Design a protein with these regions (language model features):
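Condensing-enzyme catalytic core mediating Claisen C-C bond formation in acyl metabolism
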Residues: 1-28, 223-290, 294, 301, ...
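N-terminal extracellular/periplasmic Venus flytrap/periplasmic-binding protein-like
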Residues: 10-13, 24-34, 45, 167-266, ...
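Glycine-rich loop/linker segments at domain edges
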Residues: 12-19, 105-161, 219
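Conserved beta-ketoacyl condensing-enzyme motif
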Residues: 25-95, 99-115, 121-139, 192-211, ...
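Conserved catalytic cysteine-centered active-site region
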Residues: 26, 60-114, 145-152, 220-248, ...
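Short, well-ordered amphipathic alpha-helical segments that serve as non-catalytic structural scaffolds
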Residues: 28-46, 71-75, 100, 150-157, ...
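Active-site-proximal alpha-helical scaffold in enzymes
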Residues: 90-121, 158-188, 255-262, 350-371, ...
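Active-site pocket-lining segment
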Residues: 155, 188-191, 276-346
């Protein structure tokens, strides 16, 4: 098997989906095309060198409308890539962006390619979750049919494992504070590709803006404000999951450049990250949020490593209930480098993009914090979990 590395990564800022999204007037395929071009420019893959890209793997879910018809290929064409560069789309829901990276690494390791762009995109303003949903009426014969609601599964995690409202709100508050601090200190600046956009204005029109920061971070939130929010997915006396302790729906794109050791040498690139292990698991769909607590031990076993050897943790915050459960189960809830710059609750969770967004963030976090090994993980809709162990080699 050949040696394979991540050599560059870039993402857009994450816009808060809805009528006021900063990316409301940019299509998903155009957003992905911007990231493809930004990635190659940062890596110095310009001009005729672009022909050396063997493939483009793009993750996404709810693959309809502008997210449909193989957006991976569409975005490749819209980026002005040579027609000889193919593209495909991968859907493992919340882990799609990480799955594309693992596919790219495996493809290159097998000797079938040398240079692949892998990433993800999601535009939840233009293609909301549930668009044209057609769930099988026999679903209830196989699992809890309510599992199609991610918020319902978050409530089930909270109830089954006694995750209090206070714990959830505390976790959410910390996410916003960490993300705000990182933004103020400019820690996201290098990973974000500035995007010129016509953003919605307060008067109903639009205004020009360079989008270079994440839209959903709330530095003014407080535990008191979070405590006042009403549950949104269930309304009985046991309900604890609110908009404040759930991830935001988002619009964003991210991509990394994956290359063989030989291609890195040929093009004068610099290896940064190496995939040590990658694991996916299935869990009860009704409590899909526990996925990381199952996937991470599987990845550690693959690598022959222990939790104590991991320096930095990036576990996506789909919901505070599941993030609290997973981190407590793993014994890392108070780890000093657990989501050190916030995650899905504060930054947003652009489903198919998130895995690539986290990998890109890690590319900048690992050298900053002096981390040798890092874990990236997320729960995945319909009862799955994914986890990757990264080694810094830069």
């Amino acid at each position: 098997m050949r040696e394979v590395y991540l050599v560059e990564g870039v993402r857009t800022a994450i816009a808060k989906a809805g009528k006021k999204s900063w990316f409301a007037n940019i299509r998903a395929d155009d957003l992905a095309a911007l990231v493809i071009n930004g990635l190659l420019e940062r890596a110095g893959i310009t001009g005729k060198k672009r022909e050396q890209v063997d493939d483009v793997f793009l993750g996404g879910t709810t693959l309809l409308k502008e997210m449909g018809s193989n957006i991976g290929r569409y975005a490749t064409i819209m980026a002005g890539m040579p027609y000889s560069v193919p593209g495909c789309t991968v859907d493992r829901m919340c882990a799609s962006g990480l799955q594309t990276i693992s596919f790219a690494i495996a493809t290159i390791a097998m000797g079938w390619a040398d240079l692949i762009i892998a990433g993800g995109v999601q535009h939840m303003t233009h293609v909301p979750m549930g668009t044209c949903s057609d769930h099988n009426p026999r679903l209830g014969e196989f699992c809890d049919p309510n599992m199609v609601s991610m918020g319902y599964t978050a409530e089930m995690v909270a109830r089954r494992f006694n995750i209090s409202r206070e714990k959830q709100d505390q976790f959410a508050y910390e996410s916003h504070m960490k993300a705000h601090r990182a933004t103020v200190e400019g820690l996201f600046k290098e990973e974000i590709l500035p995007v010129e956009a016509e953003v919605p204005a307060d008067d109903g029109g639009t205004r020009k803006m360079v989008v270079d920061r994440d839209q959903g971070i709330r530095p003014d939130t407080s535990l008191e404000a979070l405590a006042k929010l009403k549950p949104v997915f269930m309304q009985d006396e046991k309900a604890t999951v609110t908009a404040g302790n759930s991830s935001q729906i988002s619009d964003a794109a991210a991509a990394v450049l994956v290359a063989s050791k030989e291609k890195i040498k040929e093009l004068g690139l610099k290896p940064k990250m190496k995939l040590v292990a990658y694991a996916v698991v299935g869990v009860d769909p009704a409590i899909m949020g526990i996925g990381p607590a199952v996937a991470i031990p599987k990845a550690l076993k693959q690598a022959g490593m222990t939790i104590e050897q991991i320096d930095l943790w990036e576990i996506n915050e789909a919901f505070a209930s599941q993030a609290v459960y997973c981190t407590e189960k793993l014994g890392i809830r108070n780890h000093p480098l657990l989501n050190p710059r916030g995650s899905g609750i504060a930054l947003g969770h652009p489903l198919g993009c998130t895995g690539a967004r986290i990998a890109t963030t890690l590319m900048h976090e690992m050298p900053y914090y002096g981390a040798k090994f890092a874990v990236e993980s997320m729960c995945v809709g319909h009862g799955q979990g994914a986890a990757a162990i990264w080694e810094w080699v830069g």
